A protein has these predicted regions:
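Membrane-interface "cap" regions at the ends of multi-pass membrane proteins
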Residues: 1-31, 36-40, 46, 52-60, ...
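TM-loop-TM module centered on a large, flexible mid-protein loop between adjacent transmembrane helices
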Residues: 74-75, 112-118, 184, 195, ...
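Hydrophobic alpha-helical segments and their helix-loop junctions in multi-pass secondary transporters
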Residues: 114, 155-183, 242-249, 360, ...
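Helix-loop-helix connectors at the membrane interface of multi-pass transporters/channels
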Residues: 1, 77, 83, 104-127, ...
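Hydrophobic transmembrane alpha-helices that form the core helical bundles
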Residues: 32-36, 44, 53-132, 136-140, ...
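Hydrophobic, membrane-embedded alpha-helices of multi-pass small-molecule transporters
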Residues: 8-27, 131-134, 168-171, 184-244, ...
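C-terminal membrane-solvent junction of multi-pass transporters and transport-like membrane proteins
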Residues: 186, 313-324, 360-408, 429-438
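Membrane-interface loop-to-helix entry segments
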Residues: 122-174, 186, 227-231, 349-362, ...
Length: 438
């Protein structure tokens, strides 16, 4: 069986997770959610963070005794069998590709702005298609090189968010005017929950650490720790940013801004360098998300190919110790989707939300099942308050599914149907023998 090289330590793995979590969401969604929840967007971040933490804890336990690449695909396969595992892997792989395609367009918009290039559709598509290919080439050099670049980008965007919190917070508390926090619930508690349903998707990405478990040293110890470290850092940054943002700028104004962090910080400082660095951090954020998506998407496909639920040719490992074929496919697919859709990804992006909830549902359900079928497996981490934690994780996914648009549900199930046809064709061709029931 082809194996990947273990090159990542604890902080390298955590960096991959932080890179996948902190994307353009915090730079844009803070405004959208503030317009819905008002100052209670702070509560929205807490609700969304706690909801995502349920799945994060389940991921941490599963990764402590299942150390193969594949993450949610491997967990679901071991818990429920090959077909449910394929559905989860199919959705998650496409999530990586579609999510990165949307982020690539975001990168192109920021890049053309800073480069002083007119942001015509053709220019955005060209830049958005080319950038994933450049990052793909970097990934082909090896995980160590890709992780090193990612860690630099992660450090820069963390520095930008910390700078925002410090500068904005200092101004806010020295001024002593907290009127923007009142009324705290202008849309009621329902507004806070509606805001949380949007913000929730800014917390996903920690599962990428589990997907690359096979490339982490001492994965049974380092992967669960990396998941929790990444989650804790991102949650603290998100809550800090939300507290400062709504304190500096009226929530209604914040909700109408296309660049809410920059708009809020202009209240606290007119320093050109600080404002430009905060704005530039969107370039760091988008690049690290694309980088992490290529890493995660390629490893998810690799894990499926190694078990031959997709053609085994995609399980090839290069001399650099990386899944060469699936890195190529993932990078090219990201660029191709941007190009073929002419940058119009709204209808495809709906699959992302659907696929995320499917994946999180099965992560929590897999923990419940594997506690029953593999009770003696050595676990370096155990979910607290079991079984309530994974049960609440399952329930939260079902609850959030009611907030999905009809388009997301139709397109999502349509993509599952396409996957099932592909699965049946590949199984017939490869003649995979039936497996025993789990």
């Amino acid at each position: 069986m082809a194996e990947l090289k273990r090159t990542l330590g604890l902080w390298g793995a955590a960096g991959i997770g932080i890179g996948a979590i902190i994307g353009t969401g915090i730079f844009v969604l803070i405004g959208v959610a503030s317009g819905i929840a008002g100052p209670a967007v702070i509560v929205s971040f807490l609700i969304a963070g706690l909801t995502a933490l349920l799945t994060g804890l389940s991921t941490a336990e599963l990764s402590s005794f299942i150390t193969e690449s594949g993450g949610s695909y491997i967990y679901t396969t071991k818990a429920f069998g090959r077909l449910p595992g394929f559905v989860v892997g199919w959705m998650k792989s496409f999530d990586y590709i579609v999510g990165a395609s949307a982020v690539s367009i975001g990168f192109a918009a920021y890049f053309t702005y800073f480069a002083g290039i007119p942001s015509a559709v053709g220019t955005l598509v060209l830049v958005g298609s080319a950038w994933p290919l450049i990052l793909m080439v970097l990934n082909l050099r090896g995980m160590k090189e890709a992780s090193g670049t990612n860690n630099v980008l992660v450090a820069l965007k963390i520095a930008a968010l910390v700078l925002f919190i410090l500068v904005g917070g200092f101004y806010l508390f020295t001024r002593g005017d907290f009127s923007n926090y009142h009324p705290f619930f202008p849309r009621g508690i329902s507004g806070a929950f509606s805001g949380a349903s949007i913000i929730f998707f800014a917390f996903i990405g920690f599962n990428t650490i589990a997907v690359i478990a096979e490339e982490v040293k001492e994965p049974e110890k380092n992967v669960p720790r990396a998941v929790l470290i990444a989650f804790a850092i991102c949650t603290l940054l998100y809550i800090g940013v939300s507290v400062v943002s709504v304190g500096l700028l009226n929530w209604q104004v914040l909700g109408l801004s296309s660049a809410p962090l920059e708009a809020a910080l202009r209240v606290a400082t007119g320093n050109f360098l600080i404002l430009e660095f905060i704005a530039l951090s969107a370039l760091f954020a988008t690049t690290s998300v694309i980088m992490s998506s290529i890493i995660g998407g390629s490893r998810a496909l690799f894990a499926m190919a190694r078990q031959r639920v997709i053609p085994g040719v995609f399980a090839h490992v290069s001399r650099a110790g990386i899944p060469f074929a699936t890195v190529l496919i993932t990078g090219i697919a990201i660029g191709a989707i941007v190009f073929l859709t002419n940058g119009n990804l709204d209808w495809l992006a709906s699959i992302f939300n659907f696929g995320t909830l499917v994946t999180f549902f099965f992560i929590n359900a897999s923990l419940l099942q594997l506690r029953r079928t593999m009770p003696d497996a050595p676990r370096r981490f155990r979910v607290p308050l079991y079984p309530f934690t994974p049960v609440l994780g399952v329930a939260s996914c079902l609850f959030l599914s009611f907030y999905l648009s009809p388009n997301a549900i139709v397109v999502g199930f349509g993509w599952v149907a396409i996957g099932l046809v592909a699965y049946a064709v590949n199984r017939r061709r490869s003649r995979v023998p039936p497996e025993p029931a789990p």
